[in-house]
Curated annotation (Swiss-Prot):
Its cofactor is Mg(2+). It is an enzyme of class 3 (hydrolase). This is Acid sugar phosphatase. CDD domains: HAD_Pase_UmpH-like. Its EC number is 3.1.3.-. The keyword Hydrolase applies. Keywords: Hydrolase, Magnesium, Metal-binding. GO terms for molecular function: metal ion binding; phosphatase activity. In murine kidney infection models nagD mutant was attenuated in virulence.
Amino acid sequence: MKQYKAYLIDLDGTMYMGTDEIDGAKQFIDYLNVKGIPHLYVTNNSTKTPEQVTEKLREMHIDAKPEEVVTSALATADYISEQSPGASVYMLGGSGLNTALTEAGLVIKNDEHVDYVVIGLDEQVTYEKLAIATLGVRNGATFISTNPDVSIPKERGLLPGNGAITSVVSVSTGVSPQFIGKPEPIIMVKALEILGLDKSEVAMVGDLYDTDIMSGINVGMDTIHVQTGVSTLEDVQNKNVPPTYSFKDLNEAIAELEK
């Protein structure tokens, strides 16, 4: 197995499943730290701040720092502020997205007369929120969605994800959003900029083919699939472009790296 200078690592289905740590997750991060290999946690979760993500990982005894976390909310805020500094935004989403947009100098409004409509996972979504978002897009606001995941793994099973919520506005308006998170290149380019490395020197680690693995493939990066989440070995082997590697878990990846 190739030795990489850095790793981009998914969270849900790779580091943990809901509130449960996945076997090999802590060991993999400890291995990288001992070797002095940089890594970033790249997640489509827009509901949490980097500090909240870090706290969850630390509760599982997985080493993490806020500056090592790249969320779809952060990438979304950067994308908008680079295009339109100080723009007005109507958003659906949690505290992670709200904080990211505000700290980027964007103005959050509660009506449809805005420059951007941004949809992130909103566990308190209502018809009225969707109505305002729909009217905003119809009024000409640029339509952004933090990530396309139609479902998310939770302890109860696969629940509706942000892509499912986004589809309501998209179907109603006939307008397709610009997605920011995996598998789009936008969030991956942001992570590579933080690392200061070329894509050939970095590998993407994740469980879900359609987002994690495709995000690496879409930017020309090697990919490491772990069979600890949604996509099985059979799933990824049958794809036109399979991952560079597929392991039962991250313990198996460590064993390969140590050869």
